[in-house]
From Swiss-Prot:
It comes from Homo sapiens (Human). Residues 130-180 form the DHHC domain. Residues 1-50, 97-173, 239-308 are cytoplasmic. Golgi-localized palmitoyltransferase that catalyzes the addition of palmitate onto various protein substrates and therefore functions in several unrelated biological processes. Has no stringent fatty acid selectivity and in addition to palmitate can also transfer onto target proteins myristate from tetradecanoyl-CoA and stearate from octadecanoyl-CoA. Palmitoylates sex steroid hormone receptors, including ESR1, PGR and AR, thereby regulating their targeting to the plasma membrane and their function in rapid intracellular signaling upon binding of sex hormones. This is Palmitoyltransferase ZDHHC7. GO terms for biological process: androgen receptor signaling pathway; glucose import in response to insulin stimulus; negative regulation of catabolic process; peptidyl-L-cysteine S-palmitoylation; polarized epithelial cell differentiation; positive regulation of D-glucose transmembrane transport; progesterone receptor signaling pathway; protein localization to plasma membrane. The active site is at 160 (s-palmitoyl cysteine intermediate). It is an enzyme of class 2 (transferase).
């Protein structure tokens, strides 16, 4: 085997390692099953603070839009239509954020680099596999080790503290939706702020809001700054993610300028692979694939067993 000090892209990887890492180690199998039964969550202090801040900032924007701009408006349909649109975008954004944060990004099972498993691969002379010394696993093609998640992640793009998770093979779709819905809601909030300022300047400041004029101005200015910051950040991230998907190249691979040893997908094939299936409105739905886990209930003495 090659020394584990650095990763070589020009080595030949065993084809079995690109699949689901099925191996015969009983201890590793039980460990993988335990991970599958638990909700994926990274216990990182900085990431959890950033995730909570994301929700608080969205809640602040929703408060200003609803209670400062829309409810005091005399135009009923203007308030209803814009309120429904903004709150739908906010719900979709936060749902996408949760799915990104709580979805396994494609972690490689720990401890599968056992002697028995390596012997079962039946490697040919000259074939090379790569073992991660940190989590004691055999790295599949295009997997990278995350020092925060402490796992090797398939097709790892980057670790994002705002979602407290890595963006990888299994949750990249939700991250793309999160950036898109945050960008759209930011644009909508900025447009509403513009209309609100025009309405207040043309009329009376005391009539355009239930709050005092100084408080109204401060709330609107903070919302404008938040909207500009969020839109700039998420629009750039959305563009880079779509570019990476279409080029079948993660951000880590692009920064390292690594020569691809894999067959790159066509642009639409990459999009269909990430979003699951041909183009449809389901691409925009963060709830697709969401399932409640069946939890066994504790049986009563002498009674039958039930599941909910």
């Amino acid at each position: 085997m090659q020394p584990s000090g650095h990763r070589l892209r020009d080595v030949e990887h065993h084809p079995l390692l690109a699949e689901n890492d099925n191996y015969d180690s009983s201890s590793s199998s039980s460990s993988e099953a335990d991970v599958a039964d638990r909700v994926w969550f990274i216990r990182d202090g900085c990431g959890m603070i950033c995730a909570v801040m994301t929700w608080l900032l969205v809640a602040y924007a929703d408060f200003v839009v609803t209670f400062v701009m829309l409810l005091p408006s005399k135009d009923f349909w203007y308030s209803v239509v814009n309120g429904v649109i903004f709150n739908c975008l906010a719900v979709l954004a936060l749902s996408s954020h949760l799915r990104t944060m709580l979805t396994d990004p494609g972690a490689v099972p720990k401890g599968n680099a056992t002697k028995e498993y390596m012997e079962s691969l039946q490697l040919k002379p000259g074939e090379v596999i790569y073992k991660c010394p940190k989590c004691c696993c055999i790295k599949p093609e295009r997997a990278h080790h995350c020092s925060i998640c402490k796992r090797c992640i398939r097709k790892m793009d980057h670790h994002c503290p705002w979602v407290n998770n890595c963006v990888g093979e299994k949750n990249q779709r939700f991250f793309v939706l999160f950036t898109m819905y945050i960008a759209l809601s930011s644009v909508h909030a900025l447009i509403l702020c513009g209309f609100q300022f025009i309405s207040c300047v043309r009329g009376q400041w005391t009539e355009c809001s239930d709050f005092s004029p100084p408080i109204t101005v401060i709330l609107l200015i903070f919302l404008c700054l938040e909207g500009l910051l969020f839109f700039t950040f998420t629009a750039v991230m959305f563009g880079t993610q779509i570019h990476s998907i279409c080029n079948d190249e993660t951000e880590i691979e692009r920064l390292k300028s690594e020569k691809p040893t894999w067959e790159r997908r066509l642009r639409w094939e990459g999009m269909k692979s990430v979003f699951g299936g041909p183009p449809s409105l389901l691409w925009m739905n963060p709830f697709v694939g969401f399932r409640f886990r069946r939890l066994p209930t504790r049986p009563r003495k002498g009674g039958p067993e039930f599941s909910v």
